[in-house]
Amino acid sequence: MTKVALLIAYQGTAYSGWQQQPNDLSIQEVIESSLKKITKTRTPLIASGRTDAGVHAYGQVAHFRAPDHPLFANANLTKKALNAILPKDIVIRDVALFDDNFHARYLTIAKEYRYSLSRLAKPLPWQRHFCYTPRHPFSTELMQEGANLLIGTHDFASFANHGRDYNSTVRTIYTLDIVDKGDSLSIICRGNGFLYKMVRNLVGALLDVGKGAYPPEHLLDILEQKNRREGPSAAPAYGLSLHHVCYSSPYNNFCCEQCSVSTSNEG
């Protein structure tokens, strides 16, 4: 059976997150509702992972099994039909038709999140839902020092909020870069997977380092504790975006150019 893969961008401001919730509007619910208008039956979506309330996405990936409908035999027509129905804060960027072996969640080999920060006392109007302005000045040099210590394979239990069950809290961060753009900056984090609120907690810790609350080396002590109570406060959700999800061949050219790059340094 054909699986239809969707590359999705959304502004998470008005939603309770990706996953369908009993009493709140979710991204998943809105897209499934749009599919139902086409198929006249519920078509479940499976995403690469769940984004929290207020978190955005430029490159979320989700799939569904193609119902018996002529529209889903053509990727471009599927994209046009869904975008014609969806609200303006959810966009299908691309559609691919894959074999039954594809799975948006289980075949993920890497994800990249980006967190946006502003140095402006009052963010520009178009930044207010996407860019967090810390109350204290911060040093990007100290933040990068701290970020370098977090790269690699570690037990990130101290950076994971409770609320999800994991077989292991060990994850690998491939890159963690502070990109300074003057009035704004991005924290770009790429890894093989992330725990619940892990990226926002990492950003919170790096901001603590940046404002001088503790030295970069203290991040290693936090890691060693393996205790969320020893970890930092999470940065706000609205600064975070799931930028892209990576898959190996033959699905690696769908969601981003970086998926086709060798992952030999990501073991």
From Swiss-Prot:
GO terms for molecular function: RNA binding; tRNA pseudouridine(38-40) synthase activity. Its EC number is 5.4.99.12. Substrate binds at residue 113. The keyword Oxidoreductase does not apply. Keywords: Isomerase, tRNA processing. SUPFAM superfamilies: Pseudouridine synthase. GO terms for biological process: tRNA pseudouridine synthesis. Pfam families: PseudoU_synth_1. InterPro entries: PsdUridine_synth_cat_dom_sf, PsdUridine_synth_TruA, PsdUridine_synth_TruA_a/b_dom, PsdUridine_synth_TruA_C, TruA/RsuA/RluB/E/F_N. It catalyses: uridine(38/39/40) in tRNA = pseudouridine(38/39/40) in tRNA. Formation of pseudouridine at positions 38, 39 and 40 in the anticodon stem and loop of transfer RNAs. This is tRNA pseudouridine synthase A. The active site is at residue 52. The keyword Isomerase applies. Belongs to the tRNA pseudouridine synthase TruA family. It comes from Chlamydia pneumoniae (Chlamydophila pneumoniae). Homodimer.
